[in-house]
Amino acid sequence: MAKPMDHVKRPMNAFMVWSRAQRRKMALDNPKMHNSEISKRLGGEWKLLSDSEKRPFIDEAKRLRAVHMKEHPDYKYRPRRKPKNLIKKDRYHFNVTYNLGEGDPLKSARLSGDALSDSLSAEKTSVAAAATRMFFSHHLSANPYPFLDLNSKISELPPAPFPHYSVLGYPSGLPAFPGMGVLAGAPHAHPSAGSPGHMLPYNCLGWPGSGPAVPSSYVLLPGMTKAQHEPYLAYAATI
């Protein structure tokens, strides 16, 4: 078996000749400085030198190259390379199995987590729906539209502190929601003094003069007259 040939160093260039003494000096001045930082600083200082300052080191590098050629006439630059078995070494410390036939384990884990969160949210929704049904069970069984029976609910409230306004803040003759006067009866109407083009129900006569007047019910469009509403008003008076 042939003995491996000894490694022959390359001849120094001008920068290496100059930095040999400078590196030693900088390492003594900064003992904790890393070698890479020293090389970086030496490279910056070398670039700042003028050609006249670099000339002696260039000449010394030429002389060393000539000596190197005499000593090693068959020299070829062969950079050191790492063995191929180290390069091809497995880069992953933990082997992760990936089987396309059975499905991705990471994907299945993610899907199971999503299913768990969906089941929790569905359970919360069902609990809230059950609580709502329990709360409104007796109201829904007695009346399919419990929220439309507003007159009976308002009559159960305590009397208002002011005679002209109800507890909910509306005038005594005005229902809690617009349009509910039709459900509660009193379809009779009269023209509004503030706005001639509107009709107001008769049950709003108890409003104070300074109270808010909300025109509603009928609007006279351009080209229409009040007489066109008379048949309806006459029919409403008979109800």
UniProtKB/Swiss-Prot annotation:
Main location: nucleus
PANTHER family, A to Z: SOX TRANSCRIPTION FACTOR, TRANSCRIPTION FACTOR SOX-21
Domain of life the protein comes from: Eukaryota
Keywords: Developmental protein, DNA-binding, Nucleus, Repressor, Transcription, Transcription regulation
One annotated GO molecular function: DNA-binding transcription factor activity, RNA polymerase II-specific
Cytoplasm recorded as keyword: no
Subcellular localization, as worded in the UniProt entry: Nucleus
Membrane-traversing stretches: none
Disruption phenotype: Ventralized embryos.
Function in brief: May function as a switch in neuronal development. Acts as a negative regulator of transcription. Plays a role in dorsoventral patterning of the embryo.
Lineage: Eukaryota, Metazoa, Chordata, Craniata, Vertebrata
An annotated GO BP: neuron differentiation
Tissue: Expressed in all cells until gastrulation, becoming restricted to the developing central nervous system later, where expression is in the forebrain, midbrain and hindbrain but maximally at the midbrain-hindbrain boundary.
Pfam families tied to this protein: HMG_box, SOXp
PROSITE patterns: HMG_BOX_2 (PS50118)
Protein name as catalogued: Transcription factor Sox-21-A
InterPro entries, sorted: HMG_box_dom, HMG_box_dom_sf, SOX_fam, SRY-related_HMG-box_TF-like
SUPFAM superfamilies referenced in this protein's UniProt entry, alphabetically: HMG-box
Keyword Repressor annotated: yes
GO cellular component, one term: nucleus
Chain residues forming the annotated DNA-binding region: 8-76
